[in-house]
């Protein structure tokens, strides 16, 4: 399918299976940096904005704007950051299934270099404090597509989330590991992959995955070896070059379609959405 054809199909998307988004809503403090900080330095940043973000929230917003209904399990706390997030979600017509948790939501400092490359420094909040009581509130319908972020899977609550995933029947996990793919313990990562999730990786994450799983760094070979090893679908996002997809019965590359770049924060999340 061409990128142009895909672009024309976006307004016609409909919900074909239940969707639940499990993850984080946080505050992004975005600043321009002429260079990344080095040890002992003192550099001046130019603040762009203070935005509501988080991988799961970006996906929830993208789905809502595409007309795709989803259950959103994005823990909201009781604090300044949480209230800002709650108000933003309300403006987007979104509610969270996990609300009024004890504590505040986390925040992230995003440094944007002149070429658009992003570097993140994160401070955790209630979004990484999942517990059994929260999970018991979630009703996951059979056949659901269930999104997880690597940020939560690599956090102290990752073990609990994977246990919950293993208990569910007839669901398709969609996992965007993000940069945390290198931080998840081997044993836990093996259990995640045993659930045969649909995994989405960007260019850098694919390189990390190839090294970690002893696979080829060449994209098409990586996709083939991934199928042989995990029997699970894989998406590799190559920014302006489009995205490769691999499954047991098909593979190919979808070219990117031209668009006006507003900013690069949340680009991968929007693609997942």
What are the residue ranges of the model-derived segments?
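Conserved phosphate-binding/catalytic region of the ribokinase-like
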Residues: 2-19, 44, 211-273
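Short, conserved phosphate/pyrophosphate- and ester-handling motifs at nucleotide-, phospho-/glycolipid
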Residues: 63, 202, 268
